[in-house]
Amino acid sequence: MIDIHCHILPGIDDGAKDMAEALSLIKLAIEDGVSRIVLTPHLHFGRFENTLSVIKQSFAALEAEVKRADIDIALAYAAEVRLDSEMLDLLAKDELPLYGCYKGQQFMLLEFPHSHIPAGTDMLVKYLKKQNITPVIAHPERNRDLLETPHKIKQFIRLGCWFQVTASSITGHFGEACQALALTYIEQGFIQIVASDAHSVKRRPPLLSQARSKVTALFGEEKAQQLFYDNPYNITASLFER
């Protein structure tokens, strides 16, 4: 499996607090069957100012420790970018931490506020698409607007967005409503990727296998392979070549 959304880079957001916890999280992921991890710290303007240079520096330190500890895992980095017009300034400077390229499109992990979908979000998405950037919308099943009005996701499907649900939503960690919406969206074919959104060993570990088993049982092995390996691989493969 490939995990393309997690907060393992130590000390730069609300994820792993230090190097020791980061290494513990990586080991947990490996034990769970993960072979590649894309580290995606929050880029949340005014809260977590994780510019590309900050992320690169943190990644280099973690990668060195992983090699020193002889841990066998492929690592790369991007960011979970909070929806904000300020992202366009970084995009113009080519300083927005993105996923890789696939079929002529660059992909970006984009986070909506948990409480709502802001007015004008569709215009921002349209602008990104004109720049050949496809947003991968993080955890739509946990957004209050979508929980209350699930069909609102369709406007972003029409715009060409991809969607990533959280593994622990599938297994019920966030409650029955989030679980039901995640499974409904998967059944309807709206979801391309499942990822851990790991933050800590205790609160939200980087575990995918239980969610994969549930998806396999409900929707078949082919669907599970797409969500947990094929699609994550396709949009991040080039990251592991740099």
Language-model-detected regions and their locations in the chain:
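Mid-to-C-terminal alpha-helical segments outside catalytic/metal-binding sites
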Residues: 208-242
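Catalytic cores of alpha/beta
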Residues: 180-181
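An N-terminally biased module of ancient metal coordination in phosphate/nucleic-acid-related enzymes
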Residues: 1-71
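Active-site environment of divalent metal-dependent phosphoester hydrolases
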Residues: 44-47, 82-84, 142-146, 170-173, ...
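Non-catalytic positions within long, well-ordered alpha-helices that form the structural scaffold/packing
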Residues: 30, 129, 186-187
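Short acidic/histidine-rich active-site segments
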Residues: 190-206
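Active-site neighborhood of phospho(di)ester-bond hydrolases with catalytic His/Asp-centered motifs
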Residues: 2-4, 38-40, 76-80, 136-138, ...
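Extended substrate/RNA-proximal surfaces in nucleic-acid metabolism proteins
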Residues: 49-164
